[in-house]
Amino acid sequence: MARTTPINRYRNIGICAHVDAGKTTTTERILFYTGLSHKMGEVHDGAATTDWMVQEQERGITITSAAVTTFWQGSRGQYDNYRVNVIDTPGHVDFTIEVERSLRVLDGAVVVFCGTSGVEPQSETVWRQANKYGVPRIVYVNKMDRQGANFLRVVGQIKQRLGHTPVPVQLAIGSEENFAGQIDLIKMKAIYWNDDDKGTTYREEEIPAELMDLAEEYRSNMIEAAAEANEELMNKYLEGGELTIEEIKAGLRQRTIACEIVPAVCGSSFKNKGVPLVLDAVIDYLPAPTEIPPIQGVNPDNEEQVDERHASDDEPFSALAFKIATDPFVGTLTFTRVYSGVLSSGDSVINSVKGKKERVGRMVQMHANQRDEIKECRAGDIAALIGMKDVTTGDTLCSIEKPIILERMDFPEPVISVAVEPKTKADQEKMGIALGKLAQEDPSFRVQTDEETGQTIISGMGELHLDILVDRMRREFNVEANIGKPQVSYRETITKDNVEIEGKFVRQSGGRGQFGHCWIRFSTPDVDEKGNITEGLVFTNEVVGGVVPKEYIPAIQKGIEEQMKNGVVAGYPLIGLKATVFDGSYHDVDSNEMAFKVAASMATKQLAQKGGGKVLEPIMKVEVVTPEDYMGDVMGDLNRRRGLIQGMEDSVSGKVIRAEVPLGEMFGYATDVRSMSQGRASYSMEFSKYAEAPANIVETLVKKQG
C-alpha cells in the first residue's frame, strides 16, 4: 500500500497551554473545521471529543493527550491535502509529564494563551519544556471576546516573560464584546467571520481606517523579521524591493523552524472566529517531519555509537512509544510516533530498551475516542498499536536487524505519597492489577509496598494527580480503596567532605566466624547550577596492596547503597553520596561478602554524626493569582506556611504572588486558598528543589521513626 499523503505534507503538532486558555475548545474546533466532528463538543457541557475520560468531562480539564489524525486543505481550499496529527496535551501542572511526553514526539506546537490572563505560571513551564526539546511553535491568543482581552499586551508578555521573539502576523479588530475579526498582515486585508456556518468561511474587506497606521507598523516589523531569514531576502529588503507574499511566508517559516521567532495569531475559538487561520498558520510555518533534524539514538550493542534515523520510508523502522492507555474493549493501546521506515500489522519488532521481541497485531489511528483500523504506518505517522506485551512509555520499537535506542525521556521523581488500602478482601487482588496498569501508563506515578507496615504506597506529582488515579481505579477497575493522609518524600544528605570512617564487623566465637573491616572516605555529592543534587552513589576503589581482596569490593558498595536507601538520620533515602574505600583488613577464614557488606553499612550509618547528616524537604514553586482585596490574607497565610515570597506582579485577574513553600505545608491548600478568597483565587505549584528541613521538623521525623 503506497503512502497516501507525501511526508512533506505531514504536520505533527501539539496544542499546549495553561489550564483554561481554551485549548480543548480549540482542538475541538480544529476537528470540526477539518470535517471530522459534526457537532462541536463544548467543554462546558462535558462533551468535548478529546476529553474522553469520564473524570476529564466532569472536571472540565484535559488529562490524557489523545492523538487525533485530521486533514486540512486550507481555509479557502488553497492547499493540497495536508495530514495534521494533533496531540491534545493537558495544561494542569500535576500532569506536566504528559506534556513532556507529547512534546518529545511533536514536530511543532501551537501554544494557546488567554487574551485576558496572558502568560500564566504554567505557560512558562510548558514553554521551558518546548525549549528543552527544541520544538518550533506558533502562538494563538484565544478568548479575544473576553473582558480585558488585549492581543498586543499578551505578545509583549511573551517577549518579556518567556524571552522569545513573537512576530504578529495578524492584529485583532476590536476586543471584548466588540471583537469582530482579524487583520491579515500578510495580505493586508480585514477578515470577518461568517456566523451562519459557525465561522467556517470568512469575507475579506479593506482594513478599517483607524487601524491602518497600526497595521502598517506591524507589517513592516513582520517583513523585517522575514527578511532576516537569509541573505537573499535581506538584500532584496535592504535594496527597497517589495517582498512577495510567498517570500514573507518562506522567511517566517525558515526562522520559525529554527526556533528564532514565534508567529502570533489571535481569535476566539468559542465564538468561532479564527481557528481555520490557526490551521493555515500550522501549514505555513510549522515543519514537516523531513524538516526537523534526524532523530538520534544509540546502538544497543555499543552504547558509545550514536546512530541517526531520517524521516524516510526507506530507512530501517524506528518508533517511540510515548503513551500507554488501557482501553476497556481492546486492552492496551501503545501510542507510537514512527520516525523512520514502515510497519505493517503482523510484523515483529524489537523493544530495544528491554531487548524483547514484540509482534504487532492490530494498528489503529485514533480520532479522539473513535478509531479506524489501519494495515501499516509509515515515517511521520502517529498510530496506536494493540496487544504489545511489555512496552512502557519511552521505549523504542525498531527493526530487529537494525536496532537503535532513541533518546530516553527523563521522568521527574514523585514528590507526594499516600497509603491506599482496599476496602474489602475482594478488592485486594483487583487493586494490585489496577495499580500495575496505571503505573504502566504513567511513569510519574509509582507504586511500592512499605516493608515495615505492609501498606501499599502510591506516589505522584501532586494531590490532584493522585486523586484522579484513585478515581480511575474506582471507575475503570471497580476497586474501592481508603486513602491515607498524604506523606512528603523527604530525603537526606551529608554536609561534610572527606570524612574518613571505619566500619568493622567481627563475630568470632569459635568455629566459622564473620570478619569485615574497611575504611571509607565519604564526601558530599556534586550540585548542578540549579542547586539540584546529583543522585545516587559515586563509588571508587583506592585499595592498594590487596588489604581488602577485590572480590569483596562490590559487597562494600552494596552495603553503602543499601544503607543509603534506609537513610542515616531519620530513615529517609540519602539522595547523593561519594564514597571511596581506601583501606581495611580481612581474615583468611572468617571474611566473606556478607561481613564486608555489614561493615560498609555500619560505616555509612555513622554519617549521621560524623558526616553532618541533614534531612531535606521538597520545596515547591507556588504561584497564587488573587484579587487585590485578599492579597494580605494570602501572603500572611503563605508566610505562616514557611513560604518565602519571591516576588509579586499585577495581572488582569489581580495580583500574582510567587513564593517558594515546603510541600509539607501545602496539603489542603486548594481548599484553604478558596475559602480565604471566596473562591476567587487560584494557584499552581510545581517542584522546585530540595532544601534543608528546620530542626523542629527533623525532630518530629526522628521521633516518628522511633
Curated annotation (Swiss-Prot):
Primary location: cytoplasm
Subcellular location(s) per record: Cytoplasm
GO biological process: ribosome disassembly
Paired cysteines (S-S): none
Alphabetical keyword list: Cytoplasm, Elongation factor, GTP-binding, Nucleotide-binding, Protein biosynthesis
Gene Ontology CC terms: cytoplasm
Pfam families: EFG_C, EFG_III, EFG_IV, GTP_EFTU, GTP_EFTU_D2
Domain of life: Bacteria
Every tr-type G domain range: 8-290
Annotated binding of GTP, by residue: 17-24, 88-92, 142-145
Any one Gene Ontology molecular-function term assigned to this protein's record: translation elongation factor activity
Biological role stated in the UniProt entry: Catalyzes the GTP-dependent ribosomal translocation step during translation elongation. During this step, the ribosome changes from the pre-translocational (PRE) to the post-translocational (POST) state as the newly formed A-site-bound peptidyl-tRNA and P-site-bound deacylated tRNA move to the P and E sites, respectively. Catalyzes the coordinated movement of the two tRNA molecules, the mRNA and conformational changes in the ribosome.
UniProt similarity note: Belongs to the TRAFAC class translation factor GTPase superfamily. Classic translation factor GTPase family. EF-G/EF-2 subfamily.
UniProt name for this protein: Elongation factor G
